[in-house]
Amino acid sequence: MSRPTSSSESGIEEGLAFQPRFDASGLVTCVATDARTGDVLMVAHMNEEALRRTVETGDAWYYSRSRKALWRKGESSGQVQRVVEMRTDCDQDAVWIKVEQRGAACHTGRRSCFYRAVTRGEGGEARVAFVDADRLFDPADVYHKKS
């Protein structure tokens, strides 16, 4: 990984160097999908250290904005993500990882964090409906707190 320079726009888009562009908070957005099915599992953030550890270990590492801490996916729950492939977008400010997900990806115990569909109600208002919402584990048991 190297830091982009202001004159390397074409290098960012067409070059072979991985030069992630971190935002003002030092983060890039990461989309994690199931390598086998293509289903979106979660969206999280990585700082430089999380990105480096992900590349080095092959396990998904993230940065928690709420806890302001680095964490390895599955550290507490055992629901590990093994990275099969990592891609970056055209301007290298986001990454996409295809993972082998063991168990649930969501801290709510569900396979994916995207377990609710936004639908249009009879009056035209946006509503939420549960889809693919079965829990694979009880968060209270895994994290020892109320869900």
Swiss-Prot record:
Localisation per UniProt entry: Cytoplasm
Cofactor: Mg(2+); Zn(2+)
Any GO BP annotation: L-histidine biosynthetic process
E.C. numbers: 3.5.4.19
UniProt keyword Cytoplasm, yes or no: yes
Transmembrane segments: none
Reaction equations catalysed: 1-(5-phospho-beta-D-ribosyl)-5'-AMP + H2O = 1-(5-phospho-beta-D-ribosyl)-5-[(5-phospho-beta-D-ribosylamino)methylideneamino]imidazole-4-carboxamide
Homology family: Belongs to the PRA-CH family.
Description of how the protein assembles with itself and partners: Homodimer.
Protein name: Phosphoribosyl-AMP cyclohydrolase
Organism: Nitrobacter hamburgensis (strain DSM 10229 / NCIMB 13809 / X14)
Gene giving rise to this polypeptide: hisI
